[in-house]
Each structure stands twice: as C-alpha cells, then as structure tokens.
Curated annotation (Swiss-Prot):
Gene3D superfamilies listed in its UniProt record: Rhodopsin 7-helix transmembrane proteins
Alphabetically ordered keywords of this record: Cell membrane, Disulfide bond, G-protein coupled receptor, Glycoprotein, Membrane, Olfaction, Receptor, Sensory transduction, Transducer, Transmembrane, Transmembrane helix
Lineage per the UniProt record: Eukaryota, Metazoa, Chordata, Craniata, Vertebrata
InterPro entries per the UniProt record, alphabetical: GPCR_Rhodpsn, GPCR_Rhodpsn_7TM, Olfact_rcpt
Record-annotated membrane-spanning stretches: 26-46, 55-75, 100-120, 140-160, 198-217, 238-258, 278-298
GO BP annotations listed: detection of chemical stimulus involved in sensory perception of smell
Family listed: Belongs to the G-protein coupled receptor 1 family.
Species name: Homo sapiens
Protein name: Olfactory receptor 13C5
UniProt keyword Disulfide bond present: yes
Sequence ranges on the Extracellular membrane side: 1-25, 76-99, 161-197, 259-277
Gene: OR13C5
Main location: membrane
Task of the protein: Odorant receptor.
Segments on the Cytoplasmic side according to the record's topology features: 47-54, 121-139, 218-237, 299-318
GO cellular component: a single term: plasma membrane
Length: 318
C-alpha cells in the first residue's frame, strides 16, 4: 500500500524564474554575456599556456587546469539555463538531472581543491624560491592537479548515488535554474538528514580544508612581502594577493552559504531562501569563472607578452 502513494518520476520541471518573463530576459542577456566572456578569457589562457614554451611552468599548468575547469563548470549548467529562459517547456529527464548533479558537484569540488593547491604553489615560489624547482617538480605538480580532479569525481559520484536512490513523490518541481543537489533532495519523500550530514561532512572536508590552506599560504606570502624594503616592490605582489583572496573568498563563501546551512530546518520564509540560493548560483557559477582569468593571469606581464606574440605570429602567417 505504501508504494501507491509514490510515483516513478521520469522528469523534473525546473522552476527557475517562471512567472517573471522580464526577469528571464534580463538574466538571459546578463548570463549570456558573462558566459561569452568566460569562454574567451579562459580559452585564451588555455591556448597561450599550451603554445608558449615560456609558460610551461607549474603555475601556468595549474592556471590552464583552472581555466579548463571553469569552462567545463559553467558549460554543465549555463547553456541549459539559457535555453530554459527562452523555452516554455522547462523540463529535464531524471538521467539528465543526475548527470548535471554529478558534473556540477565534481567541478565545484575540484575547483576548491585546485585553488588550495595553487595557493601552496605560490607560497613555495615566493617564500622558498630556491627550493621551488625541487618541491614543485613535474613529478609533484602533475599528480597534484590530477588528484584534484580525482577527488572531485569521487566525491560527486558518492553524493549523486545517494541522491538518485532517494524515493521521489509526485512533486517534481525543482525550485532552481538547474539540478542543484540540495534542490533535488528537497523533493524526496523520505528523511534526508543522512544525506545532509554526508554533504555537510564532505563540504567541510573539501571546502574548509583548502580554504584553510589558502588563508595560511597567503598570510605567509603577505608577511614575506612586507619584509621587502622597497614600497614599490611590495605594492604589486600585495595587490595581486588581495585580488586573488577576493576571488577565493567569493567562490568559497558562496558555496559555504549554499551547502552548509541546515536545509531540513528551512520551513519559514522558504521563498526568500530559494531566491537567495538562485542569487548565490549566479555568483559562484558565473562571476567567479569570469573573474579568474583576469585576476590570476591576464593582468600578468608574461601572459600579455604571450598574447602579443601569438597575435603577431597569426598576422605574420596571414
């Protein structure tokens, strides 16, 4: 008799901004422009980091990984979100939703871990420059980057399997732009406290641990910078560190707000909370990937020279 109250869902309806056509049009234009900037900025960085031999260093290897990751991260959700803004039928299959959840969580976890690895790389380069070639050899930095991807994939696979095994009732309306794992969990007609606890533990491990490494690394870097006698020599590294910390705090902070609040206790003002989650989505899914190329590399002298060299070579070939 218990199964009579349940139906096997084959698709979900993504509510997004349904009922607000003007907002949908505004968000479509805004997110589309940001997505194009993300593709151009990160694509350029990947291209020059491969083609320019001077950029074949651990730092640019990590930056290339970050750029590729940001393109993948946004592509898992942004195109489908843009289509849903213009379409009256805003549905996604159960299997498509599971794939979207897996890719989204995998990319998010990978980026958190990779940002921690990149902070450690900069700490060694600035605070221990003589030992840098030994510590950050190819045998070290390639496994570091690969490990970030593996951690993200494993964590996401575990989380996604736990969610798709939940029983879902007749309510198939996801109050979000995409299949965010928490938004999908809300639809389960079962106790999700166990899922929330596992998500809390993994988020703490893969978000706060890299964040702690980032804070410690940049604190030591800043202390090392202040030992430089020349104020001119301090200004550029200081501004670079502050800019990078801003991006990291924006990315990690929004994910912290998204995944570490007790969702099972959200009974009052749920509409306001869902609106907040949608706003957070814009920040950590679009803003951070758009800012990363500018903050981490496109202001860098070596990168600017590499871009100029690439353009000159292209014009010469013509």
């Amino acid at each position: 008799m218990e199964w009579e109250n349940h139906t096997i869902l084959v698709e979900f309806f993504l509510k997004g901004l349904s009922g607000h056509p003007r907002l949908e049009l505004l968000f479509f234009v805004l997110i589309f422009i940001m997505y194009v900037v993300i593709l151009l900025g990160n694509g350029t960085l990947i291209l020059i980091s491969i083609l320019d031999p001077h950029l074949h260093t651990p730092m640019y290897f990590f930056l290339g990984n970050l750029s590729f990751l940001d393109i993948c991260y946004t592509t898992t959700s942004i195109p489908s979100t843009l289509v849903s803004f213009l379409s009256e039928r805003k549905t996604i299959s159960l299997s498509g939703c599971a794939v979207q959840m897996f890719l989204s969580l995998a990319m998010g976890t990978t980026e958190c871990v990779l940002l921690g690895v990149m902070a450690f790389d900069r700490y060694v380069a600035i605070c221990n420059p003589l030992r840098y070639p030994i510590i950050m050899s190819k045998d070290a930095y390639v496994p570091m980057a690969a490990g970030s991807w593996i951690i993200g994939a494993v964590n996401s696979a575990v989380q996604t399997v736990f969610v798709v095994q939940l029983p879902f009732c007749r309510n198939n309306i996801i109050n979000h732009f995409t299949c965010e794992i928490l938004a999908v969990m809300k639809l389960a007609c079962a106790d999700i406290s166990g899922n929330e606890f596992i998500l809390l533990v993994t988020t703490t491990l893969f978000l706060l641990t890299p964040l702690l490494l980032i804070i410690v690394s940049y604190t030591l870097i800043i202390l090392s910078i202040f030992k430089i006698s020349s104020s001119e020599g301090r200004s550029k590294p200081s501004s670079t560190c502050s800019a990078r910390l801003t991006v990291v705090i924006t990315f990690c902070g929004t994910i912290f707000l998204m995944y570490m609040k007790p969702k099972s206790q959200e009974t009052l003002n749920s509409d306001d909370l869902d609106a907040t989650d949608k706003l957070i989505f814009i920040f950590y899914r679009v803003m951070t990937p758009m800012m990363n190329p500018l903050i981490y590399s496109l202001r860098n002298k070596d990168v600017k020279e590499a871009v100029k060299h690439l353009l000159r070579r292209k014009n010469f070939n013509k």
